[in-house]
């Protein structure tokens, strides 16, 4: 099992109670000495990531991916990727492909190395087990542990009771084994319509845990399956499939989010019945629950995310404002930054909210060490250096990365007319303003010291150009660079040489940290300024940026060449994150 990308940060991982559980199992040799069907020794730690292919993965799934693959890596085990594809109505190969791509992008592999050095893939589908699942369901029927219920879904729900009232047994609960087997086989043969019968476990209708009140194990669904086609018209439920798939794959530690805590007794019930029938042997897999990732200023409900897409409130599932992994990838987040974030938040037993600034902080910390630098003017104002020769230009240089001199320098031209940021000039500056204003001197970063000498205005009195003179002996990197002391430094690009680029300034999709809490309409919390498209002027070398190349635009933040809309020689840039958290103010 390989792990290609690892976080660059050396911060220790946050508390992870699951490591203590695994350590105890290793000390007790709980899963030692096992062999697969071929007689090969099995790892003592085998985990799995089991998504349902009914949508795009989001940042919450990244926590589970990093947890399952990370634990397997750290303990010398392996992690399986398994698609829980038991609901043909909602699933599609489009989602299968996107999930495979997302897990690979995060830096993980489900392959292991065989004894002959070959790669052994551990990519599985629950649908591959349909024949076995059906046979195991018949085993439960034969043991008197499952029965066919002919009530409607509404009747079953009503008879299940609630936390204060026990459930009521189905009138079909005492059908004979023979009748149940025949009905189940007729269900498989397609003799009944959807909803006409279900297979239920026969457990305890008075159990305090409502999950254990004769849960449904199989239902009829005449629908085309993305892998098995029309072979099946009955499909197993998640609770039946999940535990059996784990056992078939020799999973040791089955890690789920907290909403499945009440399902753990059913997980154990199914496996123990099949063990007692001789299907499985001890040690059985064990389910453990951890807190899901709840991120402020975001929603992760597939239904609500789909609503945003369907109503065109965002530009698709990979919109850089979306919390989907295809979205954050297009936004410019790196796999390493997401891993770093997951390491920092750790694994807990109780649900909590993680502030978006924690994720953005991990992104900044990762990009600070890897992103090349560049200059961009986002809100341009013309600066004319009147005493600089017309038609002439000269080279200025700056480090590609200030902390990595081995990367060398980048070179860009300075000429008579430049673009500067509009906010770097103020005709009537407030106290403490050290940038450009009439009579003041500032340094053009990597260039000369200049003095503002005047302005041009339009008919409405708006400043449309600033005039200045430069001090020829003050160029950065020359002996005279420090001969004139100034307090202000501004960035710039040559007007004649700059790359005129489309830049998309992305921000948080919601203004409210909890957009759908407490009965709110999450659409009311949409941030109208979450996307601004501007024309900016960039240093000319940025024209050669390739899709997914990341940069720090000095003084502005981190940006990425869009992986979808960039063209050769014409990259489009997305803002990944600012240089500091502006939402914490």
Curated annotation (Swiss-Prot):
Q: Which reaction does it catalyse?
A: tRNA(Gln) + L-glutamine + ATP = L-glutaminyl-tRNA(Gln) + AMP + diphosphate
Where is the motif named 'KMSKS' region mapped on this chain? 299-303
Gene3D superfamilies linked: HUPs, Ribosomal Protein L25, Chain P
Which EC number applies? Answer: 6.1.1.18
Show which residues constitute the signal peptide.
Answer: none
**Which keywords fit this entry according to its UniProt record?**
Aminoacyl-tRNA synthetase, ATP-binding, Cytoplasm, Ligase, Nucleotide-binding, Protein biosynthesis
Listed name of the protein? Glutamine--tRNA ligase
**Which species does the entry assign this protein to?**
Cupriavidus necator (strain ATCC 17699 / DSM 428 / KCTC 22496 / NCIMB 10442 / H16 / Stanier 337) (Ralstonia eutropha)
Tell me one GO molecular function of this protein: ATP binding
């Amino acid at each position: 099992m390989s792990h290609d990308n690892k976080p660059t940060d050396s911060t220790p991982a946050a508390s992870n109670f699951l490591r203590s559980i695994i350590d105890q199992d290793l000390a007790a040799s709980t899963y030692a000495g096992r062999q697969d069907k071929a007689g090969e020794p099995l790892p003592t730690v085998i985990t799995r990531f089991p998504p349902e292919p009914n949508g795009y993965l989001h940042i919450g799934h990244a926590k589970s991916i990093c947890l399952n693959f990370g634990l397997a890596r750290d303990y010398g085990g392996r992690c399986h990727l398994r698609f829980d594809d038991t609901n043909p109505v909602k699933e599609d190969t489009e989602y299968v492909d996107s999930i495979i791509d997302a897990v690979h992008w995060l830096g993980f592999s489900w392959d292991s190395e065989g004894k002959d050095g070959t790669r052994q893939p551990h990519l599985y589908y629950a649908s591959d087990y349909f024949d076995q699942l059906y046979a195991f369901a018949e085993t439960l029927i034969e043991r008197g542990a499952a029965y066919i219920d002919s009530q409607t879904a509404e009747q079953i729900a009503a008879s299940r009771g609630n936390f204060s009232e026990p459930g009521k047994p189905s009138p079909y609960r005492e059908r004979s084994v023979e009748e149940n087997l025949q009905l189940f086989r007729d269900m498989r043969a397609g003799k009944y319509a959807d909803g006409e019968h279900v297979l239920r476990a026969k457990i305890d209708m008075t159990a305090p845990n409502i999950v254990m009140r004769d849960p449904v194990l199989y239902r009829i669904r005449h629908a085309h399956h993305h892998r098995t086609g029309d072979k099946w018209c009955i499909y197993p439920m998640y609770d039946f499939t999940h535990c059996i798939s784990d056992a078939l794959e020799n999973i040791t530690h089955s890690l789920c989010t907290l909403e499945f805590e009440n399902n753990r007794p059913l997980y154990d019930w199914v496996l123990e019945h099949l063990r007692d029938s001789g299907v499985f042997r001890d040690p059985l897999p064990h389910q453990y629950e951890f807190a899901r990732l709840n991120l402020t200023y975001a929603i992760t409900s597939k239904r609500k995310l789909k609503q945003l897409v369907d109503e065109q409130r965002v530009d698709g599932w990979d919109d850089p404002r979306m919390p989907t992994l295809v979205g954050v990838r297009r936004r410019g987040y790196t796999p390493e930054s997401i891993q770093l974030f997951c390491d920092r938040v750790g694994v807990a037993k109780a649900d909590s909210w993680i502030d978006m600034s924690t994720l953005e902080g991990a992104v900044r910390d990762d990009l600070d060490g890897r992103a090349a630098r560049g200059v961009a003017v986002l809100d341009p104002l013309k600066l004319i250096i009147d005493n600089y020769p017309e038609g002439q230009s000269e080279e200025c240089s700056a480090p590609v990365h200030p902390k990595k001199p081995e990367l060398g320098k980048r070179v860009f031209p300075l000429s008579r007319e430049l673009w500067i940021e509009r906010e770097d000039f103020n005709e009537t500056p407030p106290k403490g303003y050290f940038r450009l204003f009439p009579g003041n001197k500032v340094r053009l970063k990597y260039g000369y010291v200049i003095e503002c000498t005047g302005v041009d205005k339009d008919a409405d009195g708006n400043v449309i150009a600033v005039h200045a003179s430069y001090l020829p002996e003050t160029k950065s990197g020359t002996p005279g660079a420090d001969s004139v002391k100034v307090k202000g430094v501004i960035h710039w690009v040559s007007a004649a040489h700059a790359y005129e680029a489309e830049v998309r300034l992305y921000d948080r999709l919601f203004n409210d940290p909890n957009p759908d809490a407490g009965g709110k309409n999450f659409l009311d919390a949409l941030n109208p300024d979450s996307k601004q498209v501007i024309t900016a002027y960039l240093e000319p070398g940025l024209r050669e940026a390739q899709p997914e190349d990341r940069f720090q635009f000095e003084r502005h933040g981190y940006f990425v060449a869009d992986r979808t809309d960039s063209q050769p020689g014409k990259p489009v840039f997305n803002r990944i994150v600012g240089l500091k958290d502006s939402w914490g103010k």
